[in-house]
């Protein structure tokens, strides 16, 4: 069965990628020009400015033929960071359960992935630099510029962002409305 990772993931920062082909992710960049820049600059800042381990989790749907992408995030990270011991890439096909992983990490960073809603509903702080449909609803920390984004990353990695019960309730409501009621 799929596991939840290992001790390197305890207290780590999880960068949860959305599906590259997801139309919900198009045109929402506010801080970065594209996904590759967002991923690389987020990892770079976390490694340089925090002591946290960093996990980059490719969207699990990309393991399926219908959801596959030509984007090679593992190669992108190796090209920029080599064999950095604090960086762990989890490919779509890797046998790690994203929800078990959520239980271990201290902070979740998303662009548009639904796991941002789920993480907040579970009480995990979420930081996003995008205009995703849920980032303005009050249960994630949204950044509109690079300095604000980097400050939120540092605060989240240091455990300074706390999800309140009303934030969790709003995330549950958002999940229900967008993931349960919106399917036909």
For each of these PLM feature ranges, what is it?
Residues 1, 139-184:
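Leloir-type glycosyltransferase catalytic cores
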Residues 21-25, 61-66, 96-99, 116-118, ...:
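Flexible loop/turn segments at secondary-structure boundaries
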Residues 94-141:
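A donor-sugar binding/catalytic signature common to diverse glycosyltransferases
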Residues 16-18, 57-61, 90-92, 110-112, ...:
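Generic beta-strand/beta-sheet core signal
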Residues 49-51, 82-84, 121:
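Short, well-ordered coil/turn elements that cap or connect secondary structure elements
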Residues 34-41, 68, 72, 96-104, ...:
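Generic recognition of stable, solvent-exposed alpha-helical segments in well-folded globular domains
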Residues 73-92:
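Nucleotide-activated donor-binding/catalytic signature segment of Leloir-type glycosyltransferases, i.e.
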Residues 1-78:
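Conserved catalytic-core segment of nucleotide-activated headgroup transferases in glycan assembly
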């Amino acid at each position: 069965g799929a596991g939840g990772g290992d001790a390197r993931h305890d207290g780590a920062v999880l960068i949860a990628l959305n599906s590259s082909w997801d139309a919900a992710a198009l045109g929402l960049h506010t801080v970065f020009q594209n996904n590759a820049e967002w991923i690389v600059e987020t990892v770079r800042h976390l490694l340089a400015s925090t002591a946290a381990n960093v996990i980059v989790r490719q969207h699990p749907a990309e393991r399926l033929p219908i959801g596959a992408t030509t984007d090679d995030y593992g190669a992108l990270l190796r090209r920029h960071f080599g064999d950095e011991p604090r960086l762990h890439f989890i490919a779509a096909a890797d046998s790690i359960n994203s929800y078990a992983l959520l239980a271990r990490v201290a902070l979740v960073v998303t662009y548009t992935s639904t796991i941002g809603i789920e993480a907040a509903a579970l009480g995990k702080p979420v930081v996003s630099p995008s205009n995703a449909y849920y980032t303005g609803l009050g249960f994630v920390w949204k950044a509109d510029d690079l300095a604000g984004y980097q400050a939120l990353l540092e605060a989240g990695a240091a455990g300074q962002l706390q999800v309140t019960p009303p934030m969790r309730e709003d995330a549950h409501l958002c999940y229900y409305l967008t993931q349960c009621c919106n399917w036909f």
